[in-house]
Design a protein with these regions (language model features):
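Conserved class I S-adenosyl-L-methionine
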Residues: 1-41
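Class I SAM-dependent methyltransferase SAM/SAH-binding core
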Residues: 45, 53-102
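A short, conserved alpha-helix within the catalytic core of class I
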Residues: 122-131
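Short catalytic micro-motifs in class I SAM-dependent methyltransferases
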Residues: 117
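Conserved beta-strand/loop positions that form the S-adenosyl-L-methionine
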Residues: 49
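A short acidic, Gly/Pro-enriched loop at the edge of an enzyme's catalytic core
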Residues: 104-112
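Conserved Class I S-adenosyl-L-methionine
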Residues: 190-278
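Conserved catalytic/acceptor-binding region of the Class I
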Residues: 132, 136-216
Length: 278
């Protein structure tokens, strides 16, 4: 029987330099949709939990007076701080190295707490209860943001081949084994769902849902796709050890065979937003 998976600090080790280039962005219109749904006017405070390199926090920063991003990975926070400086947001952003389960004292009260594809990595009941205590009692919002899992994203009609996802996944398995890797452990059953039940038990009585539509055509280079693979927890660079160079060479050969021009087409995923109010 496989031991239960436990978080460790290597989960995203080495992925930060690849993250921004490799991950597809959230759907255009997400900040505007969130602002309209929650009445955001630039005066509140945002807590982004599991912020990574600021992928979500920085595009939302103009909606708040202050943004606090929390992440346990120092590489992610360094990327976030660098990008915030480039956007002229240093004075409005703060980056805190901590696990969500160990949020430090003194963070203050927040209007909104966001979790962008991060909540499933956490002790969700503990984090939900802690974050509820940090949110405004009169309508503070716990916001879960992720790519919409339903709906086809065919590249049909676009100018370049689709990314050969199944072949890439097979290559990762050849190097790392058949069971999904996650830090130093294995994750055979994937990450958990059921956020509604978790948040209800934590005392969030109201839920809203909105979908920000995607579907826009995207052009991706071989370098973009390689970065995407190396940004994932299950194919993080450190997992390959001394074979990282060989894996990347095989991956590039696979991609150039699929598209000799070195270009791929994808469609922007839609973004699902679920909101629980205090």
């Amino acid at each position: 029987m496989t031991d239960p998976w436990q978080w460790d600090e290597t989960l995203f080790a080495g992925t930060a330099p690849h993250y921004r280039r490799g991950r597809l962005p959230y759907a255009p219109g997400l900040p505007e949709s969130l602002a309209a749904e929650l009445g955001l006017d630039g005066r509140g405070r945002l807590l982004d939990v599991g912020c990574g390199p600021g992928t979500l926090a920085l595009p939302l920063a103009h909606l708040f007076r202050e943004v606090v991003g929390v992440d346990p990975d120092p590489g992610m926070l360094a990327e976030a701080e660098r990008d915030a400086s480039g956007r002229g947001l240093t004075g409005r952003t703060r980056w805190v190295r901590a696990r969500a389960e160990q949020l430090p004292d003194g963070l203050g009260e927040f209007t909104v707490a966001t979790f962008g594809n991060s909540f499933h990595w956490m002790d969700r009941a503990r984090v939900a209860a802690t974050v509820r205590g940090l949110l405004r009692p009169d309508g503070g919002a716990f916001v879960h943001i992720a790519d919409l899992k339903t709906g086809a994203r065919s590249a049909e009609g676009l100018p370049h081949p689709a990314v050969p996802g199944a072949a890439v996944a097979d290559l990762v398995r050849r190097y790392l084994g058949p069971v999904r890797r996650a830090g130093r452990g294995l994750l055979p059953d994937g990450t958990p769902g059921g956020e509604d039940e978790v948040l209800a038990r934590a005392g969030f009585p109201h839920r809203r849902r909105l979908v920000v539509p995607g579907g826009q055509p995207l052009e991706r280079t071989v370098d973009d796709v390689v970065a995407g693979v190396l940004s994932m927890s299950y194919s993080a660079p450190h997992l390959f050890g001394e074979r990282l160079g060989a894996f990347e060479a095989d991956l590039r050969r696979l991609l150039h065979t699929a598209s000799p021009a070195g270009l791929f087409s994808e469609r922007q995923p839609s973004t699902e937003v679920r909101i629980w109010l205090n």
